[in-house]
């Protein structure tokens, strides 16, 4: 069971959705962090689509990994895609509209989503930072090499906002350490971070490297 095997499978099965300079799908979450040098052990593979249509297409390509039927549990965390119900579509309790699928690939949960925020959701221009699963990531995608392939990922400069807002101290430290050792895009960081997190990040990034 490894995220590397799951990612290789996804890139083979759904290669057109991740190819080119402006792909319609990208890797986010802990796997994106690991691909960019963070010392993490991802337990699942999170994927994001620019439009709902790409989630539908991904589900079609993943047909071999969808059982005919699944006895769906009441808890969303254990829901799996099936031939009968390949996607879960609809609003959550906070007004975000999801197109979502989840498959088990080589023992790893692979999740693909498009998430439409409710009207009035704050954006970077409002000082709220860039939401890692939102529409503002697409102009900033970065490509990394993995198994001889160019893989589109959300940059660490955007992921740091998610990590800090969720209070993930270990991941924040990992991302900061990589950014200290690489060519950190400070302009993107300033746009990606909410006003509440900018000062704290500046103190971290300008501190001693591990």
Task: Give a label for each model feature.
Residues 1-210:
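Compositionally biased terminal segments of proteins
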